[in-house]
Amino acid sequence: PELAFDEIEGLGPNGGFTNSICHVDHALKASVSFEEFCKNPKPIVVGAVQGASCFGPAYEFTFILDTELRRRKIRDKVPMTFVTAEPYIGHLGLDGVGDTKGLLESEMREHHIKWMTSTRVKKVEDGKMHVEEVNPDGSVKTAAELPFGFSMMLPAFRGIKPLMGVEGLVNPRGFVLVDKHQQNPTYKNVFSVGVCVAIPPMGPSPVPCGVPKTGFMIESMVTATALNIGAMLRGQAPRHQGTWNAVCLADFGDSGVAFVAQPQIPPRNVNWASSGKWVHAAKIAFEKYFIRKMRKGESEPFYETAALNMLGISKLKQVITD
């Protein structure tokens, strides 16, 4: 997708005043900015703007910053504020998973991080962010100017220009419409997977919130799509459906939060979340395992499939046929 930095004045790393971690080059630039910031610590503002759908990395980045500032012995010089479009902390675009609200609020209190929810960013200036907290009825609750020396705000996403405005193919934001088989209802030869898929929001919220597309969920989309294309090539109708299950490890630098949502979109069969230092260790182990797997060219080794099956986590729904 496209990163819609241009929808908010002053947002983004290219000509704006905030950083991003959406691309490798953005992350490298953010690292340089952070090193400069540490020479002269000031307030930090991190979060996700209106229309964003990828909230998890904003939480991870916030707590990883907190951990790094403590390691450098300058955390006491840096007030931190988390600004998000979510109606509550831990919503994640999913109306929460398990007790992510309680877990993440507790972590923020423990780490002295203030937060603002149902908040839209009006514009960003050099060292100053203009925001509005919004009431449930859509009226402005409070307007504020947040000073910062370093900021990372995740933007909203939108579809790519070649697809924009194609009736029956995409929604108004340019995301591809699909049915339960990942197939576009109008253009039967078009399948879509990943971030470009159109998923309705969980429900009305004072400030627009998108729905995230997580890694395992996307793998389930890809699995179903590959099998359905194969079926069509054999003259059969598509019948495979991805589970859209979510298995996530959010690393907080020295601890973290893990959650399992089956499926990711409620109502769910499994709705579990937990936290602790074990999540940090598990995330490091998974990253090393995943990189090794990719280098070897293995998408899903048999032992990974066996482990997921043992945990009752699958990529495909069981489809009953006559």
Predicted segment positions?
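C-terminal auxiliary extensions adjacent to catalytic cores
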Residues: 259-322
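Cofactor-binding loop segments of dinucleotide-utilizing enzymes, especially the Rossmann-like FAD-
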Residues: 49, 85-87, 195
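Rossmann-like NAD(P)H-binding beta-loop-alpha module
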Residues: 23-81
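FAD-site-proximal beta/loop scaffold in flavoenzymes
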Residues: 2-7, 11-40, 147-220
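A Rossmann-like FAD-binding core segment of flavoenzymes
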Residues: 66-175, 236-238
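Flavin (FAD/FMN) cofactor-binding core of flavoprotein oxidoreductases
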Residues: 240-258
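Short, flexible/disordered intra-domain loops and linkers
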Residues: 58, 90-96, 203-210
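Internal hydrophobic alpha-helix adjacent to the cofactor/substrate pocket in enzyme cavities
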Residues: 216-244
